[in-house]
UniProtKB/Swiss-Prot annotation:
KW Glycosyltransferase (keyword) present: no
Residues the record lists as Isoleucine amide modifications: I14
Keyword Membrane assigned: yes
Tissue occurrence: Expressed by the venom gland.
GO biological process: killing of cells of another organism
Localization, UniProt: Secreted; Target cell membrane
Organism field: Polistes rothneyi (Rothney's paper wasp)
GO cellular component terms, A-Z: extracellular region; membrane; other organism cell membrane
Keywords annotated in UniProt: Amidation, Cytolysis, G-protein coupled receptor impairing toxin, Mast cell degranulation, Membrane, Secreted, Target cell membrane, Target membrane, Toxin
Functional description taken from the UniProt entry: Mast cell degranulating peptide with high potency of histamine release (EC(50)=0.09 uM on rat mast cells). Also shows high hemolytic activity (24% sheep erythrocytes lysis at 50 mM). Its mast cell degranulation activity may be related to the activation of G-protein coupled receptors in mast cells as well as interaction with other proteins located in cell endosomal membranes in the mast cells.
Protein name from the UniProt record: Polistes mastoparan-R1
């Protein structure tokens, strides 16, 4: 799991 990509997606959703 790419946490950087996942985190960026979450931040973008907020």
């Amino acid at each position: 799991i790419n946490w950087l990509k996942l985190g960026k997606k979450i931040l973008g959703a907020i």
